[in-house]
């Protein structure tokens, strides 16, 4: 399909009104995911290319008076030199990967079948830990605050539907540990992950949010964005 010329005739490719709504919503932050969904660790990529990509992202944000301070790396690919680029351009925080060998940053070729299989199983059984963090004890990396991932909220799968209770329990149990110890539990997903099986995905999200609400009432758990920790 050809890309349209404005949000009015092509809302799937343009979303300035959505950006403005997010910017006005209390507690929400607009961060960066790079300009071109840049894969830092794939063969042939250079630091100069990454710098140009970040400069483009900053320029676009500036047009809407948005100050970018938090960053999420596409495919969770990054190295220390990429963090240094972000720091020099004013970023203060980024989402880091879970501290397990199966989540270690790598290019596509490094994502072996074994790593993928363990990551999938880890969504249903606690194979790598709860990934609860004390962000202030962890310090910084290359001058940036690392807000480490705890869990990707993977989308509903009809093939794995019998395991859904295990997936939800995996998330809730980690939230329980965070609430009991005053730690950080960082749950994330992409909006398009809910594009299929919307009812099933929203139902899971409601269960997670209801569980959070109980911890908010009983233990004072709060919902924060990445920039809040920088």
Stretches found by the model and what they are:
Residues 147-160:
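C-terminal active-site rim and adjoining tail of enzyme catalytic domains
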Residues 1-70, 75-147, 163-187, 194-230:
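Catalytic alpha-helical scaffold of carbohydrate-active enzymes acting on polysaccharides/glycoconjugates
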